[in-house]
Amino acid sequence: MAEIGIVGLGKMGANMAERLRKAGHDVTGFDRDEGSGRDVESLSELVHALPTPRVVWVMVPAGEPTYATVRELQGLLAEGDVVVDGGNSRYTDDQRHAEDLAGTGISFVDAGVSGGVWGLTEGYALMVGGTDGDVATVQPFFDALKPDGESGFVHAGPVGAGHFAKMVHNGIEYGLMQAYAEGWELLQAADVVTDVTAVFDSWRSGTVIRSWLLDLLVNAVKQDDDLSELRGYAEDSGEGRWTVQAAVDHAVPLPVITAALFARFGSRQQDSPAMKVIAALRNQFGGHAVTSSAGSQQVGADSPGADATAPAGTHDPASGRARGAAGTVPAEGAR
């Protein structure tokens, strides 16, 4: 079997190293954290422990941590070696890494990896970018990491294609999760369905919306029926933003994924400034009720089509006269 080095032994990296070892490969792991279970104490030691041509798989956070790791590897590796970035890097970063490494004869392959903490037992879906020759060099490791069967691996194209495919995959994931979440909220809000968890559980078999995400949702709500242990606060990994930005660059309409991303932004606001503006404007033009920051509500007409009392001194454009508090203005829906 082949030998490989893995840089980054977090949840994903450590599990991938274990899966590779179970498949019979020799793995040398390095992480800057002394408590990570690393095999060596430096990148230099990792490189010197591997036979040539070397394959080094990088599993560190995207951005500067990946850039710093690739830069250091560039000074340690030799012509014919291959660097694989299996993190969630942006595809444009891949292209830059490949260009930088090419000057010293080092190859670069990008691998979009999906599977999370379940990948150790179920396998990792792999979306790969690189030349045919470089992908072939790493193929034994791809075969060990991927799920059993014919699917779960794709050579998507040249360098950058793997992470571009993974980026779109994550964008789709945003949309799917948002759809399940909205359906859940509507079922909970109505008094028609008495067992929302059972409804979602029933959808896991035979329906057109069954999926692994649905399985995970049912698992979560069976542990916490109304999700009361959680706050409605959702971070984003960054790939949803990249997906939306790529859609703008290519003039591709992406309403569902964009809305799902923006919903996460909204979840992180304690008090929406935009909604404050809307509340203020509705009160100004229609006298609609508003709620103060202290929680008290001012009286005003807030039902569709209702007339509202105008603030004293409001100018009536039809009569040219200033109206007092007794005057009326059309409600929001009538304007």
Model-derived regions, located:
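Rossmann-like NAD(P)-binding element
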Residues: 32-34, 38-96, 120-130
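Hydrophobic beta-strand scaffold residues
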Residues: 27, 108-109, 254
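Intrinsically disordered, low-complexity terminal tails and inter-domain linkers enriched
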Residues: 293-334
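Rossmann-fold dinucleotide-binding core
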Residues: 4, 69-71, 90-181, 185-187
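Helical "substrate-binding/catalytic lid" subdomain
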Residues: 127, 137, 160-288
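NAD(P)+-binding Rossmann beta1-loop-alpha1 motif at the extreme N-terminus of oxidoreductases
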Residues: 1-54, 117-119, 283
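Conserved dinucleotide-binding and phosphotransfer motif residues
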Residues: 23, 104, 250
